[in-house]
Structure formats: C-alpha cells, structure tokens
Amino acid sequence: MEGLRMRICTICVRAGSTGVPGKNWRELSGLPLYALAVQQAKKSGLFDRVVVSSDAAEVLENAMFYGADYVVVRPPEMASDKAAKVPAIAHAVRTAEGHFNETYDVCVDLDATSPLRIVADIVGAVELLETTSAASVITGAESHRSPYFNLVEEGEGGFVSTSKALPQAVVRRQDAPKTYDMNAAVYVWQRRFLVEEEAVFFPTTRIYVMPPERSLDIDSELDFK
C-alpha cells in the first residue's frame, strides 16, 4: 500500500435503532460495539485519524476515552430512520478535515454492528482499493442462495421467476455466477467519490471477500446470541 496516503476511518453511530434499541453501544466482550470498532481501526495502524460520528450523547461523551481522535455531532436530518448512512460518513470526513486542516486521500467506514471482522479484513479492503483502480471497495461473503437459481421475484398476476435469468437456465447452484451477501464490515473510498458523489457503487467498485463466520451484521436480538 502507498504509505504517503492520508487515511481517515469513521465509525457512524446512530442513536435510534428500530430493530435493536441502542445496539451500537450494546456491550460485547466488555466493550460497546462502537468502541470495538475504534480499537480495531487503531490496531490496524492505517489511519491518520479515527473519528466517531453520532447523535447520541453517551457516544459523543465517551468515544475519545476509547481511542477516537475526534467526535462529530451527526446532524438530526442525517440521523433519522429514513436517512441514508453515506451522507453522514461524508459529513464526518468534511468536518474532520475542517477541524484538523487536513485532506484525506482514502476514507474508510467501519460499521459498529459488524464486530466479528478482524484487523486483516480492514487492511485487506484498504489494500484492494489502493492497489487497483477501484473507486470504492465493499466487503461481503459468498451467498448461499443465488438470484440465478433459487431466489425468485413475483411479477404481474402473482407469477414468479428467478430474479436474474441467463440465456440458458441454471440447473445447479454451482453453475451460477458467484454472488455475495454484503456484510457492512468495511467500506473504502477514494475520497472524491465519497465526498463528491456520496454513493457506494461505481463502475469500478470491487469486493473484498470475507468468510461467513466473520460476516455477522447485527440487526436483531437473536444476532447477539
């Protein structure tokens, strides 16, 4: 990887959670989930700044205790159930740049609710971005169900068909193109694509593949068990 690049890592922690209230600061192994993400970012040794963005007072008051370099108050319009996350990430990057008078080359976001990722996953995703022409990198695990084989959509009249059709029907899942479940563990961008476009996917987006056992994205009480 290019050692002279400036890198920032954000951990965006929204106060509201419909599925699991307060899930971002629920404890796992004795630490709030967002604190685990902060410590993973620090252990990677990749980042010039690790920034936590939140609208939750509890998080804003304690994030720097767990190692964050800076906290950003997430605007109310970016913290509702209907708000997309990417604008909040871009806002955190811009705010940190203004505070530290720095401009970052690579922007990374770690989802607090993906605690099973390891430092090697963060390093691998960043390396994939920096050694290719990718505008962004997502992470995911190979999916067990396939839109070419055993995922269907209901159309007009209630009739169903496979979600994606090929000229020749796929009769074995193994013969279908590989598909992946996004796991939200790591997102990586070249800065301009995040800050100017505020999107995840571009024509040159790549995926860093993780094993299923590290791909948990906590979204229910059952996931904590």
Enumerate the predicted regions with their spans.
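Conserved core of the sugar-phosphate nucleotidyltransferase
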Residues: 87, 91, 115-203
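Catalytic metal- and UDP-sugar-binding loop of GT-A-like glycosyltransferases, i.e.
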Residues: 110
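Residues in the short beta-alpha loop(s) of Rossmann-like NAD(P)-binding domains
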Residues: 31, 54-57
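Conserved active-site beta-strand element of glycosyltransferases/polysaccharide synthases
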Residues: 206-209, 216-217
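N-terminal nucleotide-binding beta1-loop-alpha1 segment
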Residues: 2-21
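Short phosphate-binding loop-to-helix
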Residues: 57-107, 117-120, 124-127
